[in-house]
């Protein structure tokens, strides 16, 4: 139970740090991990799934080993307080909810000022879409979809793995998510090499995505709409995790997501999520941000309660 209290306090402090401070402005550990992963790719790259699997395994193991060693050292030198501070620092580093919401609201401000070109310039901070082909409503839709998906990736999923495996679990989840963004796409260079990272990201993101969809239904303006859109449309999305999250957000907010989009000069025609909803407008960005904030807060409560329950059961078994 003592270890769980340390973990719980660290998660709460880290979440508070993200709310108050946002992402670290300099020397972000995730950026450092990305540079190390890119250097490893230059050495290990082969047009083969096995080479990509080795790259993924080494990078994730390196992140977990570093955080585990840091936690043990802090506990040895400063006891439970030191371990709590490490958990808080890792949580703050891994969570990205505040940065996500700030970037989304920056685009919303540009759209409200009728500065569509400025909104297009800001959009790459949120997603990899080609912004020049988008009008104001198209930019707004891209932002709402990015807020939905990244609420799962940058907040809820990390908290789920933190509850399951502490700071090392959070580090592993962020490492996998970062590798997927770097190599887990269908470019000629990464079609085979990035296969392992993409599949591992799908598996790691599965529980967080479902929890995000449930919480979006509970916290949104239309729980019934969220559940209906999730049930009807999530399965048609090409991503097994983005589908439930984006469908639930679409139904909760009463808007349509999905449709035609462009990545790297390649046009994709994705199924519409929540066909009963209306087209996204610029005002919907603020609504999506509010929903994302509520989902993040609820996720902290749920994962903390789940961790406490698990720790209590372990204590009961140990006392028998």
Question: At which residue positions do the language-model features occur?
Answer:
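Short amphipathic, positively biased membrane-proximal segments
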Residues: 1-320
